[in-house]
Amino acid sequence: MDRGTWIGNGNAAEKVSLTARDDVLGFPGFELETIQGTVMTVCDFYALTEQGFVYAGRTAGYDFDDAAEGDGAWPLDLTGDGRSELITRSTFGDGMSCVFVYRWNAAEGGSQRSEVDWDKADAQLARLSAPLGVTARAETYHAQDNTVTLTLYTESGTKETTLPLTTDVLGEWSTE
């Protein structure tokens, strides 16, 4: 995917780019990317459905276009229904990241969002949270092998586990 044309010069407080995407929740669509300030990137995704353009999902962060982690959004059919979900990685101001998954809900004509449920994904790691004095949690998606790494930062060190990203480790689906 090539980036679209940027609107705004190098010193602009905000830059905007519009990029066509072949697969947004199984539909053609586009990504509206804005760089806010000097480092914060926000990407909103829209799918061209039977109802017209519909909001599909979002990713935001400080380290997009990172060679190791990618651009923050990946289409992949996680549910096995033949339609791709949109997997996104958002990085927050404290440096911690979270993985969100968006899917198309045909009955409601819109997207739904879910995220990794730590209790489902790794009950042992989730149980360590309280006794170890957790200072932060992070999730990193690895598109090359469709895995997610859960990292628990504690007062006594870092604990992490990597497992396949499947619908079995996701929480409830909610409408944006």
Model-assigned labels for residue ranges:
Residues 1-24, 61-64:
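Short N-terminal edge-element motif at the start of the domain
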Residues 15-31, 75-81:
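Acidic, divalent-cation-chelating loop motifs in proteins
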Residues 35-176:
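Acidic, small-residue rich beta-repeat scaffolds with periodic aromatic anchors
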